[in-house]
Amino acid sequence: LECHRRGSFISDGKITCSAKKTFCCKMYEKIFGIYWYGCAKTYTEKNTWNVYSKCCTTNLCNT
């Protein structure tokens, strides 16, 4: 699985996930306006007052 990656100290691009990480995720930290993209081992989706996150089994949801 190849996911887009982005973080506060990581440049935009793509990363190949390890075999144990089967989800591409994106997370938006609403207070500071920081986006993070990458691979994840478990599925986590939430939308709270300070964090929005979404994961899927392709890289379509973390672009």
UniProtKB/Swiss-Prot annotation:
<feature type="disulfide bond">
    <location>
        <begin position="56"/>
        <end position="61"/>
    </location>
</feature>
<feature type="disulfide bond">
    <location>
        <begin position="25"/>
        <end position="55"/>
    </location>
</feature>
<keyword id="KW-0800">Toxin</keyword>
<feature type="disulfide bond">
    <location>
        <begin position="17"/>
        <end position="39"/>
    </location>
</feature>
<keyword id="KW-1015">Disulfide bond</keyword>
<feature type="disulfide bond">
    <location>
        <begin position="3"/>
        <end position="24"/>
    </location>
</feature>
<comment type="similarity">
    <text>Belongs to the three-finger toxin family. Ancestral subfamily. Orphan group XIX sub-subfamily.</text>
</comment>
<dbReference type="GO" id="GO:0090729">
    <property type="term" value="F:toxin activity"/>
</dbReference>
<comment type="function">
    <text>Activates bacterial pH-gated potassium channel KcsA by binding to its extracellular domain, probably at a site different from channel inhibitors. Increases both mean open time and open probability of KscA.</text>
</comment>
<dbReference type="GO" id="GO:0005576">
    <property type="term" value="C:extracellular region"/>
</dbReference>
<dbReference type="InterPro" id="IPR045860">
    <property type="entry name" value="Snake_toxin-like_sf"/>
</dbReference>
<protein>
    <recommendedName>
        <fullName>Toxin Tx7335</fullName>
    </recommendedName>
</protein>
<keyword id="KW-0964">Secreted</keyword>
